[in-house]
A protein has these predicted regions:
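ATP-binding glycine-rich loop module of kinase domains
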Residues: 44-68
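Protein kinase catalytic-loop region centered on the HRD/HxD motif
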Residues: 134-144
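C-terminal lobe helix-coil module of Hanks-type protein kinase domains
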Residues: 190-279
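Activation segment signature within eukaryotic-like protein kinase domains
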Residues: 128-129
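Conserved short submotifs of the Hanks-type protein kinase catalytic core
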Residues: 96-110
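Conserved HxN/HPN-centered segment at the entrance to the catalytic loop
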Residues: 82-91
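AlphaC helix of the eukaryotic protein kinase fold
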Residues: 65-80
Length: 279
């Protein structure tokens, strides 16, 4: 289905953009597309018309409270997100008693599916890296902080352009500057900036997203994260982000140009003042 088409049972477009609650019909068939951070993305298909849409909801009862908090924060920001760079929810609903967001259908591949595999050519890496930077730059120009940049929040379209999703931790600059943590607590430890942890008193701003971007790009280029933790060491990510220095990418992968290696290491600077200041 073309992403601009809408099924016959889809509510009026104007109502959707007003944040109308969308009531799911009983005969809709759901198929899990991806799971990330306690949230499941599902394709919802009407068996008679063949029309479809996408919903996001908690993966389990155990994750429901946190996932609902994230989804509601994302929904509250829907009017400042733009379709040109964001996967934007257009309505909310209930799925099996759980809060859920509704999205128009779109074709994508989560960048997380490529995690752990280094991109084979430097030119291909640079092309993808630029496409990842484009929506993040647009988001920052809207005075918004993402707060959870990771492979699971980056959507790669069939034409290789990228969109951002998973805005559960996102907030406006003005909200972030008033505190040391983001508006909604949480995050994904492996990609979290030092200031986003509980162990520093530095405010979280857009440069926190740049650190997380550096983590994402480092893994795409080298096939591994800057810090390798054992299965029993996963609770210590904050320590590694604050106190450990990553190996230079050109040490891990000799074909990486020195300048590119330097760029990634600058993104991963511990203090935000020492990073690039904008995308």
């Amino acid at each position: 289905m073309n992403e601009n088409e809408q099924p016959a049972f889809w509510p009026a477009q104007g109502n959707l953009h007003q944040g109308r609650v969308f009531v799911l019909k009983e005969d809709v068939i759901f198929t899990v597309l991806a799971q990330e951070g306690g949230i499941a993305w599902m394709n919802a298909r009407h068996p008679h018309s063949g029309g479809s849409f996408i919903i996001a909801t908690a993966v389990s009862d155990e994750e429901e409270e946190r996932a609902t908090r994230l989804l509601k924060n994302e929904f509250a920001l829907r009017d400042v997100l733009q379709d040109s760079w964001a996967i934007r929810a257009v309505a909310s609903t209930q799925y099996r008693g759980r809060f859920a967001l509704v999205y128009a259908p779109f074709s994508f591949e989560l960048l997380a599916r490529r995690a752990g595999r280094a991109i084979s050519g430097i030119a291909r890496f640079i092309e993808l890296a630029i496409q990842i930077c484009v929506p993040l730059r647009q988001m920052h120009l809207q005075n918004l902080i993402h707060g959870d940049i990771k492979p699971g929040s980056i959507f790669v379209y069939h034409d290789a352009t990228c969109r951002l999703g998973s805005f559960g931790l996102s907030c406006r600059f003005s909200d972030a500057f008033s505190q040391t943590r983001l508006t909604v607590s949480g995050g994904t430890p492996a990609w979290m900036s030092p200031e986003h942890t509980t162990r520093t008193q530095r405010p979280v701003d857009s440069r926190s997203d740049l650190y997380s971007l550096g983590m994402v790009l480092y893994e795409l280029l080298t096939g591994r994260l800057p810090f390798e933790l054992g299965a029993d060491d996963q609770t210590n990510w904050a320590h590694y982000h604050i106190a450990s220095e990553p190996l230079a990418p050109d040490v891990i992968r000799p074909d990486v140009p020195g300048m590119l290696s330097t760029i990634l290491l600058k993104l991963l600077e511990k203090h935000p003042d020492n990073r690039y200041q904008t995308v």
